[in-house]
C-alpha cells in the first residue's frame, strides 16, 4: 500500500457546499461583505480579518436560541485571556433538541445488531425525565455529572439533561481501567454519577458492577444513577427514570451563560496525571456548527456516523451535529465485529442506516484496504478520518472502495474541542493533505513555509472554543504553561507539519514524536506507510537508537 500511486482523489461534487453558499448569502443580506461564490480564499480572508463579525454572523445564521450579548469578546490583552461573547446567553439543550418531533434524532446500534431509534420528540421526553430526576436530587447550576458509559443514547440524554440544568458533563468509556476513571473523575468532585451495568466488545460481556461500586465509594456522589446494557441492576444505584411519551413537549431547558462550563474533557495522561480541560457552552457549539455545516456540508436530512467512544472528543463533536438538524449514529462495540454478509458490523450499520457522512480513522481504512474490494455505500456523501495522519494511498483506496466521495481528513484535539484543519467543499483535494485550515482559525506552522519545510502547528489569534481553564488551576498558570509556553499570544499545539502549494495541510505527527537522524526529520506519518504494508504486523514501536 505504501507504494501505491497517488492518483487524483475524488473531488467534492459540484453541488456540494450548499450550506457554505447559504452562509455567504446570509452575510451579504445582513450587511456584510458580498463575497464571490466558489472562492474559498475570500471567505477565509474575511474570517481571519474580521473574526468578531464572522462568529457573530455564524450565531445568527445558525439561529441559536439565546442572545450573543453586546460584546464580541473580553480580553486581558492576550490570546490566552480572550473569551468570546462574555455577555451571551444560549440554550444549548434546546439548540440540539429543536426540530420536528417526528424527525429521527438518534439511530443507535451495538455490535450484536440490536438497534434503538429515538425521534426528536422521544429524545426530548427522555431528557426532560432525567432533568427532573436530577433536579429532585438537588442537582443544579455549577454541579457536575460524571458518566462511565458506552456510546449509547443514555450518554447523550445525560449530557443534554446536565446542560439543561446548568451543570457540567464529563464522561469516560468502559475500556478505561478503574484507576484511570477515578484519576479523571475524582478532581471534579461530581454531584452525580451515572454508570452502565456493563458493555459488550468483540462478543464478550464486560460487567461494570465492581468498578461502579469502587467509584461510588471513592466519589461519594449525592446521586448515583445507572442503566442496564447487560440486564443487571447495580446495588446502591437508582435506575434512570423512564420517560413519559409526550411529556417533554411542554418542557423547556434553561438558558446558560455562553461562558458557563459545559464539558470537562481529559488529556491522555501520558506525561503525568490527566488534565481536566474545562470547555464553555457557546464556544464549542459555534465551532462545531461551523465545522459541520460550512466544512462538511451537513444539514437537515443528513445522517452522521462516527466511530468513537464517550472517552474521546469526537463523541462531543458528533453529539453537536443534532444542532444542525442531522441524525446522529451511535455505534457501540468493536468495529470489526461480524456484520451483514462479508461486511463488518460498523460498515453494515453505515449502509443499512443510510448515513450520508461517515467518520473513520487511518487504522480502520487500513484494515478495509487489507480486506479488499467491497460495495459502495449508496447514501454516502462525505467520508471523514481523524485520529492520526492519513497515509497518501488512502485517497486512491477510498475512491476505489467508496466511489466519487470526498475523503476529508480532519485534525484538532481535545484541547480545543474542534479542528484546526479539515475538509472544505470549495478547496482542491490533494492526496496526502487536509484541504486547509478551518475558517477563522489563524493556524500556521512555526518555522514552516510553502516549500515543504515543516514546523510546529501554532495558532496566533483567539477562537471561541479555547478552554476556559483546567481543573484545580485557579490562576490559569498551568493552562498558559500548557498551551501558551513562552508567548501568551501563540497557541502551541504540538503537531508537526507543513503547507502545500495549494494551501493544503500535511501533518507528519506530533512534534515531540519527531525523530531527527542526521538532520533529517521523520514524523510518525513517514513510518505508517511502509509498516501498514505488512499485514503480519499487529503493532510496533519506533525507537531512536544512536549508533554505537
Predicted regions and their residues:
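Flexible, low-complexity linker/hinge segments
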Residues: 199, 235-260
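Conserved AMP-binding A3 loop
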Residues: 116-121, 254, 262-286
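Conserved AMP-binding/adenylate-forming
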Residues: 351, 381-504, 511-514, 527
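AMP-binding/adenylate-forming catalytic core of the ANL superfamily
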Residues: 147, 172-197, 351, 358, ...
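Conserved AMP-binding/adenylation subdomain of ANL enzymes
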Residues: 285-303, 313-356, 371
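Conserved AMP-binding/adenylate-forming core of the ANL superfamily
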Residues: 42-46, 93, 105-160, 177-182, ...
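Adenylate-forming
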Residues: 150, 192-211, 332-335, 353-396, ...
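Structural core segment of the AMP-binding/adenylate-forming
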Residues: 164-242, 361-362
Amino acid at each position: 500500500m505504501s507504494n501505491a500511486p497517488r492518483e487524483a482523489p475524488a473531488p467534492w461534487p459540484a453541488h456540494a457546499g450548499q450550506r457554505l453558499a447559504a452562509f455567504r448569502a446570509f452575510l451579504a443580506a445582513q450587511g456584510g461583505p458580498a463575497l464571490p461564490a466558489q472562492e474559498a480564499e475570500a471567505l477565509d480572508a474575511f474570517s481571519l480579518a474580521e473574526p468578531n463579525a464572522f462568529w457573530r454572523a455564524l450565531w445568527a445564521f445558525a439561529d441559536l436560541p439565546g442572545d450573543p450579548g453586546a460584546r464580541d469578546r473580553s480580553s486581558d490583552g492576550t490570546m490566552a485571556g480572550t473569551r468570546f461573547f462574555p455577555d451571551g446567553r444560549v440554550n444549548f439543550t434546546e439548540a440540539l433538541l429543536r426540530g420536528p418531533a417526528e424527525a429521527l434524532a438518534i439511530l443507535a446500534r451495538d455490535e450484536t445488531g440490536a438497534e434503538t431509534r429515538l425521534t426528536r420528540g422521544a429524545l426530548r421526553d427522555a431528557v426532560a425525565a432525567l432533568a427532573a430526576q436530577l433536579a429532585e436530587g438537588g442537582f443544579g447550576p455549577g454541579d457536575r455529572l460524571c458518566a462511565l458509559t458506552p456510546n449509547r443514547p443514555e450518554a447523550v440524554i445525560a449530557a443534554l439533561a446536565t446542560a439543561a440544568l446548568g451543570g457540567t458533563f464529563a464522561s469516560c468509556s468502559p475500556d478505561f481501567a478503574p484507576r484511570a476513571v477515578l484519576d479523571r473523575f475524582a478532581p471534579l468532585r461530581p454531584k452525580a454519577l451515572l454508570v452502565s451495568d456493563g458493555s459488550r466488545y468483540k462478543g464478550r460481556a464486560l460487567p461494570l458492577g465492581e468498578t461502579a461500586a469502587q467509584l461510588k465509594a471513592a466519589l461519594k456522589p449525592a446521586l448515583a444513577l445507572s442503566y442496564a446494557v447487560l440486564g443487571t441492576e447495580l446495588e446502591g444505584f437508582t435506575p434512570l427514570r423512564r420517560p413519559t411519551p409526550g411529556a417533554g413537549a411542554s418542557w423547556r431547558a434553561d438558558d446558560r451563560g455562553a461562558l458557563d462550563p459545559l464539558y470537562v474533557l481529559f488529556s491522555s495522561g501520558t506525561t503525568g496525571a490527566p488534565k481536566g480541560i474545562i470547555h464553555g457552552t457557546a464556544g464549542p457549539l459555534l465551532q462545531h456548527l461551523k465545522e459541520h455545516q460550512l466544512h462538511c456540508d451537513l444539514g437537515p436530512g443528513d445522517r452522521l456516523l462516527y466511530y468513537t467512544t464517550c472517552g474521546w472528543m469526537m463523541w462531543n463533536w458528533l453529539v453537536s451535529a443534532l444542532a444542525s438538524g442531522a441524525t446522529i449514529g451511535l455505534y457501540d462495540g468493536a468495529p470489526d465485529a461480524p456484520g451483514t454478509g462479508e461486511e463488518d458490523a460498523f460498515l453494515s450499520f453505515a449502509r443499512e442506516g443510510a448515513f450520508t457522512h461517515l467518520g473513520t480513522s487511518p487504522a480502520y481504512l487500513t484494515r478495509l484496504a487489507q480486506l479488499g474490494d467491497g460495495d459502495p455505500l449508496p447514501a454516502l456523501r462525505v467520508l471523514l478520518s481523524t485520529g492520526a495522519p492519513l497515509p497518501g494511498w488512502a485517497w486512491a483506496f477510498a475512491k476505489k472502495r467508496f466511489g466519487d466521495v470526498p475523503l476529508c481528513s480532519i485534525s484538532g484535539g481535545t484541547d480545543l474541542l474542534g479542528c484546526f484543519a479539515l475538509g472544505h467543499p470549495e478547496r482542491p483535494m490533494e492526496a496526502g493533505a487536509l484541504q486547509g485550515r478551518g475558517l477563522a482559525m489563524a493556524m500556521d506552522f512555526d518555522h514552516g513555509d510553502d516549500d515543504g519545510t515543516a514546523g510546529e502547528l501554532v495558532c496566533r489569534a483567539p477562537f471561541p472554543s479555547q478552554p476556559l481553564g483546567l481543573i484545580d488551576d485557579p490562576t490559569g498558570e498551568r493552562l498558559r504553561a500548557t498551551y501558551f509556553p513562552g508567548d501568551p499570544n501563540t497557541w502551541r499545539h504540538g503537531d508537526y507539519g507543513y503547507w502545500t502549494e495549494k494551501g493544503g495541510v500535511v501533518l507528519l505527527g506530533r512534534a515531540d514524536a519527531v525523530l531527527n537522524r542526521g538532520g533529517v526529520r521523520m514524523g510518525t506519518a513517514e513510518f505508517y506507510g511502509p509498516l501498514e504494508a505488512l499485514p503480519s504486523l499487529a503493532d510496533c514501536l519506533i525507537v531512536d537508537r544512536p549508533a554505537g
